[in-house]
Amino acid sequence: MSNNDQKRDEGYIEKLVQVNRVAKTVKGGRIFTFTALTVVGDGKGRVGFGRGKSREVPAAIQKAMEAARRNMIQVDLNGTTLQYAMKSAHGASKVYMQPASEGTGIIAGGAMRAVLEVAGVQNVLAKCYGSTNPVNVVHATFKGLKAMQSPESIAAKRGKSVQEII
């Protein structure tokens, strides 16, 4: 794993996806602030992302980590991979994720890789199309993971057995 991750007392894996310097132009010159995008997960299906802004980088990262811990979702995984292939989009970013066999690893780029690693997905094939803006890619990945349901829950909603829907 990269040097961007840390283990916390609560057992969460934290990853820094992006730090960006932004400038506000005022009469006296420019005011620089920093934005941070982070993802947090327990490696067992719980994952969250957050954004933070501050005049200093460490404060922005801390705010983003706190926001990520407040914004956690539960993902229904099939062992160490996804339940089924899916597409998702946010803005101009489109992501495609599909389950992979054991031993494949996480084949995904940048921001998607960080989300999938902290979520506990170990075998997946993923591709990002359109805009590769990390914020939109993380949003799109979350939309897809949040919408994914296990076959058992789908069968229960339809009042059928798992074999009938598979």
UniProtKB/Swiss-Prot annotation:
Gene3D superfamilies: 3.30.160.20, 3.30.230.10. One of its GO terms (cellular component) is small ribosomal subunit. GO terms for molecular function: rRNA binding; structural constituent of ribosome. Keywords: Ribonucleoprotein, Ribosomal protein, RNA-binding, rRNA-binding. InterPro entries: Ribosomal_Su5_D2-typ_SF, Ribosomal_uS5, Ribosomal_uS5_bac-type, Ribosomal_uS5_C, Ribosomal_uS5_N, Ribosomal_uS5_N_CS, Ribsml_uS5_D2-typ_fold_subgr. It comes from the Bacteria. Residues 12-75 form the S5 DRBM domain. GO terms for biological process: translation. Part of the 30S ribosomal subunit. Contacts proteins S4 and S8. Belongs to the universal ribosomal protein uS5 family. The N-terminal domain interacts with the head of the 30S subunit; the C-terminal domain interacts with the body and contacts protein S4. The interaction surface between S4 and S5 is involved in control of translational fidelity. With S4 and S12 plays an important role in translational accuracy. Located at the back of the 30S subunit body where it stabilizes the conformation of the head with respect to the body. NCBIfam families: rpsE_bact. This is Small ribosomal subunit protein uS5. The gene is rpsE.
